[in-house]
């Protein structure tokens, strides 16, 4: 009863379109979208340095080469086979 119904919103929308026209409303919509996009980009730029700091504060791990492990494992198995044969 006290709220705005869908019919009242439709009447307001028709009046706004008649007053401003579709071209003006389209321009306002694109300007509003561009400003929101710029705002989100500015907020996102502030968050990126914080994320970079988080990744740089992680523990340092040595990089391991898988091929070295395989060659070491193969050499160890061949040495153990040689010992068994002796």
Curated annotation (Swiss-Prot):
It holds the Pfam family TatA_B_E. Keywords: Cell inner membrane, Cell membrane, Membrane, Protein transport, Translocation, Transmembrane, Transmembrane helix, Transport. Residues 47-58, 68-77 have a biased composition (Polar residues). Residues 42-86 are annotated as: Disordered. Coiled coil: none annotated. One of its GO terms (molecular function) is protein transmembrane transporter activity. GO terms for cellular component: TAT protein transport complex. GO terms for biological process: protein transport by the Tat complex. It is a single-pass membrane protein. The chain crosses the membrane at residues 1-21. Belongs to the TatA/E family. The Tat system comprises two distinct complexes: a TatABC complex, containing multiple copies of TatA, TatB and TatC subunits, and a separate TatA complex, containing only TatA subunits. Substrates initially bind to the TatABC complex, which probably triggers association of the separate TatA complex to form the active translocon. Part of the twin-arginine translocation (Tat) system that transports large folded proteins containing a characteristic twin-arginine motif in their signal peptide across membranes. TatA could form the protein-conducting channel of the Tat system. This is Sec-independent protein translocase protein TatA. It comes from Photorhabdus laumondii subsp. laumondii (strain DSM 15139 / CIP 105565 / TT01).
